[in-house]
Every structure is written in structure tokens, then in C-alpha cells.
């Protein structure tokens, strides 16, 4: 799934001409990959991407009322996902498994579920998009390695690991 998402995101980016890597490539890719991991339908990816942008803006603003309103939007979003999966088996995907999780004999309520998914989604999307940006910057500044990796694609996994070890997304 990740490879197909990467290919389609690259193909879309190639149609743009000039490209702002983070907003027009890394962030959309991260949202798509995270949505696939969570088992969320592709139809809600644009909505999630818009929500993430509003969430980042609200956080930067320091306005607690705005931040709270954006958090409520995510709860409504999660509630729709939960309703759509109400009768799904717990092993359908990771989101459904979480929705069937019981703590002290009771299921997670909407607020708890939204909190876990919000922290997970925002954190993972940030890490994935930062990693993509770091890797693209590294490739742009190391044309010799671009060529070497084109000629020897088997080197990609260790090269990616090494670049992200040197310049990690969480630093």
C-alpha cells in the first residue's frame, strides 16, 4: 500500500511544476500513508489534511478556544469513523481494533478514542512528513547519491536509515 501511495503522490506532484515540498508533497503523502495504516477510507484524506492544517494553525495561534474547537472537530470526525465501523470485526484494521478495546471492562468513550487517535495521527503524520522532507533535502544536496541509488536501488533501505539516523525527524 505504501508503494502505491508513494507512486500516486509523486505522479500528482509531477503535475504541479513548482512544488513546495512539505505542503504539496510530504504532508499529503503522510496523511495518505497514516490513513491507510489506520484503515481509514481514502475519501476522508482531504478532510483529515484540512483538519491537520487547521489544528497546526490553532496551536500556533495560542488561542485555547480555537484549539478546543478544532479538537471537537476531530471528535466528530472520529465519531463518524466509529459509526461506520460499528459492526465491523475487531481485526478489520487498527482503528477498529482500538474501537473494540476495553479498559476495566468498558469500551473507550468517544473522547478517549479521539484523544488516542488525534495524538497518534498528529504525531505520526508529523514524523512521516518530516522524514520525507529530510530525505528529499538530502537527495537534492547529494546528486552523486541520487545517481548511485538509481543505479543500485537495493541500497535505498540502508541509505534511508542512515540519513534519518544522522538527521532524525524528531530532533
Task: Please tell me what each predicted stretch does.
Residues 1-171:
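Cytochrome P450
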Amino acid at each position: 500500500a505504501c508503494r502505491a501511495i508513494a507512486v500516486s503522490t509523486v505522479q500528482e506532484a509531477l503535475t504541479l511544476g513548482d512544488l513546495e515540498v512539505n505542503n504539496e508533497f510530504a504532508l499529503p503523502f503522510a496523511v495518505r500513508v497514516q490513513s491507510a495504516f489506520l484503515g481509514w477510507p481514502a475519501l476522508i484524506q482531504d478532510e483529515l489534511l484540512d483538519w491537520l492544517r487547521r489544528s497546526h494553525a490553532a496551536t500556533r495561534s495560542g488561542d485555547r478556544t480555537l484549539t478546543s474547537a478544532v479538537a471537537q472537530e476531530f471528535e466528530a470526525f472520529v465519531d463518524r469513523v466509529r459509526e461506520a465501523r460499528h459492526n465491523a470485526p475487531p481485526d478489520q484494521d487498527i482503528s477498529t481494533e482500538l474501537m473494540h478495546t476495553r479498559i476495566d471492562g468498558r469500551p473507550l468513550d468517544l473522547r478517549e478514542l479521539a484523544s488516542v487517535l488525534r495524538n497518534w495521527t498528529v504525531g505520526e503524520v508529523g514524523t512521516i512528513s518530516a522524514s520525507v522532507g529530510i530525505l528529499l533535502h538530502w537527495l537534492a544536496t547529494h546528486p552523486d547519491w541520487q545517481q548511485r541509488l538509481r543505479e543500485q536501488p537495493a541500497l535505498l533501505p540502508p541509505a534511508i536509515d542512515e540519513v534519518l539516523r544522522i538527521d532524525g525527524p524528531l530532533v
